[in-house]
């Protein structure tokens, strides 16, 4: 499965963890990163998230973001197709960086564009994103765990018990 994390998702572990939603999303993002490190997920990125963290005044956040982005198996270069799609997304109400993120993920044919931004989640679900789904990190981890459980169940039910 290919995943594109936007900057909001990558930075979630540094947000105020006193809110349950933020804490859950942070844990989910860290789990996604762990799955990428294990080779169970492929991380796609683009030039856009490489620009945004550089603008962050907090060095710890910058280092973390660049470390996550370094795990990407594919870096999507912005081209005229991505810019055109981003303009269309902008016309639908997405902010410029959000439109570039989503456009890059769609053009790269990522399975999932993961974000914690409510506005982007809402607009992304209302927008034509072809095969790319737009879930929260928590939803993504639930889907992965559910799929893993189903696969484990199928594997165990097809294994015949040995007769001794």
What are these regions (language model features)?
Residues 62-87:
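Helix-adjacent hinge/juxtasegments
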Residues 59-67, 123-129:
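Short, aromatic/basic amphipathic alpha-helical patches
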Residues 9, 49, 82, 100-101, ...:
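Alpha-helix capping/helix-boundary segments
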Residues 14-18, 81-90:
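Short, basic, glycine/proline-bearing loop/turn elements
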Residues 77, 96-99, 115:
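Short beta-strand scaffold positions
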Residues 2, 17-26, 91-92, 106-164:
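Acidic, PIN/NYN-like endoribonuclease modules and their adjacent C-terminal/linker elements
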Residues 3-57, 70, 74-75, 138-142:
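PIN/NYN-family metal-dependent endoribonuclease catalytic core
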């Amino acid at each position: 499965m290919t995943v594109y994390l936007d900057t909001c998702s990558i930075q979630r572990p540094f947000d105020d963890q006193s809110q349950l939603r933020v804490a859950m999303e942070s844990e989910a993002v860290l789990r996604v990163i762990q799955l990428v490190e294990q080779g169970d997920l492929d991380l796609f990125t683009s030039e856009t998230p490489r620009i945004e963290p550089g603008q962050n005044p907090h060095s710890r956040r910058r280092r973390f973001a660049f470390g996550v982005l370094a795990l990407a198996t594919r870096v999507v270069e912005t081209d005229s197709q991505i810019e055109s799609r981003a303009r269309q997304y902008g016309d639908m109400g997405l902010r410029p960086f959000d439109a570039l993120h989503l456009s890059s993920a769609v053009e790269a044919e990522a399975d999932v564009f993961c974000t914690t931004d409510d506005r982007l989640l809402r607009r992304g679900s209302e927008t034509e994103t072809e095969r790319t789904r737009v879930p929260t990190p928590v939803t993504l981890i639930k889907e992965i765990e559910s799929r893993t459980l189903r696969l484990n169940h199928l594997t165990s039910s097809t294994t015949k018990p040995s007769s001794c």
